[in-house]
């Protein structure tokens, strides 16, 4: 039987860690080589891409923003910047209109400096910030640049003090920090009450499936569909190997001549081909059936140089 190869996109339920979902799928497929991309906190639900089999070697080549829908609770701050933490300060939220809030949100659109939550996985002198925070240690985190591509106010409840927002942002953005900072800007504090991820890289909600229930046995028909990885790498240019000789050379780790075969390069909208192609730009290598054979780059001699080779020989 052919080994599974591709991605399963789980609609992560609340209460489980991302690693819990990976462990469940390891039991479902009966293999260890499974890994996720883009950790979600236990309370967060939504799109969790999980690579199956050798597709784990493609994780580092994923690109794209992430999108979320969340509720920001005004009138309090917590030590974790979400509802899982302890309330450390409370203050009544002001009488404020949706137009007022939209005006304030303009401060958080585009490239901004953001300080991560103290309960986060950021490293401080070799130790995770959340471990230091749990021990009661005092420390300060350095703000980092993140990009908020979209920040829309969907609704505002004056009675509940709740903002429902839609966010599209760069990888590494903390929505908890965004909630905290928006609350500070309004002047009453705030924290993230709930969060759902709707997009991660090129994975969207329509790709997602329910996490299989715990079981000692998973019949084939109950296993989630493994999606072809090609559809998630459209940001990469691709090159097709057309002869058996080329494929054997590729699987043996040898370079493939490119200079006379430039017409076989399909350029993604993210790249441009000119007289001098950008060296070391990642290229998806495919066979005639559009199956991924690996990842390559162009070297100085204008040859396709293997970086990731699937089904290697020799």
Curated annotation (Swiss-Prot):
Gene Ontology process terms (BP): mRNA pseudouridine synthesis; tRNA pseudouridine synthesis
Primary role: Responsible for synthesis of pseudouridine from uracil-55 in the psi GC loop of transfer RNAs.
Cross-referenced SUPFAM superfamilies: Pseudouridine synthase
Keywords: Isomerase, tRNA processing
EC number, as in UniProt: 5.4.99.25
Enzyme active site: 41 (nucleophile)
The protein's name in its UniProt record: tRNA pseudouridine synthase B
Family: Belongs to the pseudouridine synthase TruB family. Type 1 subfamily.
